[in-house]
């Protein structure tokens, strides 16, 4: 067993095994149980504004987004899809509602996949054969995206509201129509704005099929509320092995959706960890401004691309112990900070120099990690900043 700069290298705890699914490709991104769980987002730009859309896709790509979806409500948007799909760094999925003609336009434009909403596309059941044939010829998958807010009227009438059973039956009915036409490159989503209903729907769906599942809490709300809803729902499902691709829906810039999605996966050890800040809520024992210190250290280390464990501690109760368990840390008190590297105190600095010193040491250790073989050289598999 090797030892990194801090804690001994040990395997990350595992959750339930991934639910076995069929596999499919969204351009060069695999989706299904044989592939890592991918993070998606959706552009907020007008799709026909090609430059703005590609700029936002570039920002999403830089943030770690794996797949991006774009809206296609008008012909001018459909006309822009080919250029967007051609120049996007990541696979582009066209999001189609109401007009079936845009499904075929998206396929012809070279989109990596198409999301269809069977609840609001005109006479969709009768067009499934054509859609299946076109998608098969292009070699792209279809996502059947059922939403509580636009549930097929037949299932709304049967169940009275968007119950888990209604969402699942609607999705599987449409999937069966595609299967009748020999098309099986399908992934499914059954989204609801209530995490409890959403979780129940995906649990039922997972028991009844082997399609890859795209997780999402629809209309989750503003950043704080939406983050909580998504984390609760995704955690409940992913911890049981359910889910193959995720999208955190927030009333916030799309990059924030990606950040939250990645953090959820990292927190469940479903993705190699990156910079993580663990901070105490502070209390009367704190001898430094924990909030400011944590924010400044986080900002200073933002973008650091190595798995570095950093502890920033605000009092003497847990401070020394936590700092010793990290690759780099500080235990603060009495206007000073003891700087730990690899569990050993290397210096004591005035409180005013803590942030600067930590950032300098972090950069030095990062360079050392890279020279030793990159992220694998670290113990935790993740940059972690612990603040208490």
Swiss-Prot record:
Reactions accelerated catalytically: (2E)-4-hydroxy-3-methylbut-2-enyl diphosphate + oxidized [flavodoxin] + H2O + 2 H(+) = 2-C-methyl-D-erythritol 2,4-cyclic diphosphate + reduced [flavodoxin]
Name its pathway: Isoprenoid biosynthesis; isopentenyl diphosphate biosynthesis via DXP pathway; isopentenyl diphosphate from 1-deoxy-D-xylulose 5-phosphate: step 5/6
Keywords of the record = 4Fe-4S, Iron, Iron-sulfur, Isoprene biosynthesis, Metal-binding, Oxidoreductase
Q: Compositional bias (Polar residues) at which positions?
A: 377-388
The note on the cofactor says: Binds 1 [4Fe-4S] cluster.
GO biological process annotation, one example: isopentenyl diphosphate biosynthetic process, methylerythritol 4-phosphate pathway
Q: Show the Pfam families listed in the entry.
A: GcpE
Q: Does the keyword Ion transport apply?
A: no
> What's one GO MF term for it?
4 iron, 4 sulfur cluster binding
> What this chain does, per the record?
Converts 2C-methyl-D-erythritol 2,4-cyclodiphosphate (ME-2,4cPP) into 1-hydroxy-2-methyl-2-(E)-butenyl 4-diphosphate.
Report what the protein is called.
4-hydroxy-3-methylbut-2-en-1-yl diphosphate synthase (flavodoxin)
């Amino acid at each position: 067993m090797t030892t990194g700069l801090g804690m001994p290298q040990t395997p990350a705890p595992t959750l339930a095994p991934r639910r076995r699914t069929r596999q499919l490709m969204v351009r060069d991104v695999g989706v299904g149980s044989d592939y890592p769980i991918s993070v998606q987002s959706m552009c907020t730009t007008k799709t026909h504004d090609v430059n703005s859309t590609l700029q936002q896709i570039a920002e999403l790509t830089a943030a770690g987004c794996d797949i991006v979806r774009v809206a296609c409500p008008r012909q001018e948007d459909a006309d822009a899809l080919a250029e967007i799909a051609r120049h996007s760094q990541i696979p582009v999925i066209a999001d189609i509602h109401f007009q079936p003609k845009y499904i075929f336009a998206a396929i012809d434009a070279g989109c990596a996949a198409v999301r269809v909403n069977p609840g609001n596309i005109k006479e969709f059941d009768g067009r499934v054969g054509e859609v299946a044939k076109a998608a098969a010829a292009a070699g792209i998958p279809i996502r059947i995206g059922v939403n509580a807010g636009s549930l097929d009227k037949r299932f709304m009438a049967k169940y009275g509201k968007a119950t888990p059973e209604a969402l699942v039956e609607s999705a599987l009915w449409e999937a069966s129509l595609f299967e009748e036409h020999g098309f099986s490159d399908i992934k499914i989503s059954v989204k609801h704005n209530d995490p409890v209903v959403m979780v129940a729907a995906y649990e039922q769906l997972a028991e009844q099929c082997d399609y890859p599942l795209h997780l999402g809490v629809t209309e989750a709300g503003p950043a704080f509320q939406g983050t909580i809803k998504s984390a609760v729902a995704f955690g409940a499902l992913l911890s049981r092995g359910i889910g193959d691709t995720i999208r955190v829906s927030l009333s916030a810039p799309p990059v924030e959706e990606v950040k939250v999605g990645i953090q959820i996966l990292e927190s469940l050890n479903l993705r190699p960890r990156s910079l993580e800040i663990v901070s105490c809520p502070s209390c009367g024992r704190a001898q430094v401004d924990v909030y400011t210190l944590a924010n400044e250290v986080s900002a200073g280390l933002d973008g650091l691309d190595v798995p570095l464990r950093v502890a920033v501690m605000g009092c003497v109760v847990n401070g020394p112990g936590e700092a010793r368990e990290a690759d780099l840390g500080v235990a603060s008190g009495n206007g000073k900070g003891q700087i730990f590297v690899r569990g050993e105190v290397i210096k004591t600095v005035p409180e005013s120099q803590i942030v600067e010193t930590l950032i300098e040491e972090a950069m030095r250790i990062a360079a050392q990690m890279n020279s030793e073989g990159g992220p694998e050289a670290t113990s935790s598999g993740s940059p972690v900043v612990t603040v208490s």
